[in-house]
Design a protein with these regions (language model features):
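Structural signature of hydrophobic alpha-helical transmembrane segments
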Residues: 1-10, 63-67, 118-125, 177-192, ...
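Long, contiguous bundles of hydrophobic transmembrane helices that form the permeation core
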Residues: 1-7, 190-314
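Hydrophobic mid-bilayer segments of alpha-helices in multi-pass membrane transport proteins
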Residues: 7-16, 24-46, 68-74, 215, ...
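Alpha-helical transmembrane segments of multipass membrane proteins
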Residues: 16-17, 38-42, 114-115, 166-167, ...
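Transmembrane helix-loop junctions in multi-pass membrane proteins
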Residues: 45-53, 86, 119, 161-176, ...
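Membrane-embedded alpha-helical segments and adjacent helix-loop junctions characteristic
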Residues: 53-136, 342-378
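Hydrophobic transmembrane alpha-helices that form the pore/transport pathway of multi-pass ion
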Residues: 104-209
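Transmembrane helical segments that form the transport core of multi-pass membrane transport proteins
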Residues: 242, 261-378
Length: 378
């Protein structure tokens, strides 16, 4: 028994050594890890090679659909918004609300950063929000640390709940229950992190003076909606809705405290809506496709292909949800939003090709790691 236990740890030990100690590129380390896991299963656990290979293939397919499909779509929407110049409008809007750097950190790094992470994932929030904070006068290292800390809870759901949905697929757990449990685990951290961000901004606990209530509500305003949304819809929307509520609550309390919010120069309401249109559409489409709208949900989920890839006993059902997949909904939102923002179909196609080029190594990494996990499960 102990021998089997030790052999089962070999793939995990390899990943720890190759990634954490040697510093090997993730794509290479995970691919070698997959090969080691297959050899381990066949030679040490006496699994039929055809079963082992089909289990790995199931994981690779899962890595492509839905994981990389969602990542592709999320990065496409983000890049569309950037290329059209709309991201600049959003950044200007957020930075015009107050001159208090502590509150700006709550709005930009915490609220907007959480929103970007829930839409695009990939640590996009850290890069974008750190750049905004640096332009507003924060030191580069300070801004980077603040954004990394702010992103610590948002990554639990990633882009449209992808990590939780993937965990549900791999473990055969209910994704709605899993999403709800994750939000409950995060509640204390979600309330605590805004206080840490304010302290990091002011470089002292005294930085909380005068904005303790705003800081508290910035966290509570994210935590409560996350729990409620996860309870009734699943893992796709909690981070997105929670971050939006946090921004709204923080801005509203700031307005009450200061008595006014600066106007955004040269930007009307229509321009702001235009800039946010892809994200608004993502929210609407994902909401309509959820179990909250049974007629739409039933129609979209009816267009599904069921695969049984594993050739051994008790194979998992691998559903390919062509219409209800978050990737399809996000892509559609990006295309419509891109048209609203004035981009042509040819421009959007070029954006899509560029995104495909950038995620090549990531695709290899994800497919290898999910394939590895599936072999270990079977």
């Amino acid at each position: 028994m102990w021998i089997n236990f030790l052999w089962a740890l070999v793939p995990i030990i390899w990943l720890i050594i190759s990634l954490g100690i040697i510093g090997m590129p993730a794509s290479r380390a995970c691919t070698i890890g997959l090969i080691i896991t297959i050899a381990d299963a066949v030679l040490m656990f006496k699994q039929p090679i055809i079963n082992t290979l089909s289990g790995a293939l199931e994981g690779i397919i899962m890595g492509i659909w839905p994981i990389m499909y969602v990542i592709l779509a999320a990065l496409f929407v983000y890049q569309i918004t950037t290329d059209s110049g709309s991201m600049g409008t959003i950044e200007k809007l957020l930075s015009s609300i107050t001159t208090d750097k502590r509150i700006l950190v709550l709005i930009i790094a915490w609220g907007f950063g959480g929103f970007l992470e829930s839409i695009a994932g990939f640590g996009t929030a850290v890069a974008i929000c750190a750049g905004i904070l640096i332009s507003l006068g924060l030191e580069p290292i300070q801004a980077s640390v603040i954004c990394l800390v702010a992103n610590s809870t948002a990554t639990a759901f990633g882009a449209i709940g992808l990590p939780v949905l993937t965990l549900a697929e791999v473990t055969n757990l209910n994704d709605v229950q899993l999403g709800f449990i994750v939000t409950l685990q995060l509640v204390i951290l979600v309330i605590l992190v805004p206080f840490i961000l304010v302290i990091l901004t002011g470089k002292s606990i005294k930085a909380l003076k005068g904005i303790v209530f705003i800081t508290l509500m910035s966290g509570v305003g994210m935590a409560i909606p996350q729990v409620i949304i996860a309870k009734f819809t699943g893992a796709e929307l909690p981070a997105l809705v929670g971050s939006l509520f946090s921004i709204l609550v923080t801005v509203w309390l700031t307005k009450r405290k200061t008595g006014s919010v600066e106007e955004v120069e040269n930007e009307g309401v229509s321009e702001i809506i235009k800039a946010c249109s892809p994200f608004i559409l993502v929210f609407i489409f994902v909401l309509l496709a959820s179990s909250l709208c049974p007629p739409v949900n039933n129609f979209l989920t009816s267009v599904t292909t069921h695969l049984h890839v594993y050739l051994g006993k008790n194979p998992n059902d691998l559903p390919i949800n062509w219409l209800s997949s978050p990737g399809t909904l996000i892509l559609l939102a990006g295309i419509i939003g891109g048209k609203i923002q004035g981009l042509s179909l040819s421009q959007m196609f070029k954006v899509l090709l560029n995104v495909l080029k950038t995620i090549g190594m990531t695709t290899i990494t994800v497919c290898a790691i999910v394939g590895l996990a599936k072999v270990m499960v079977y």
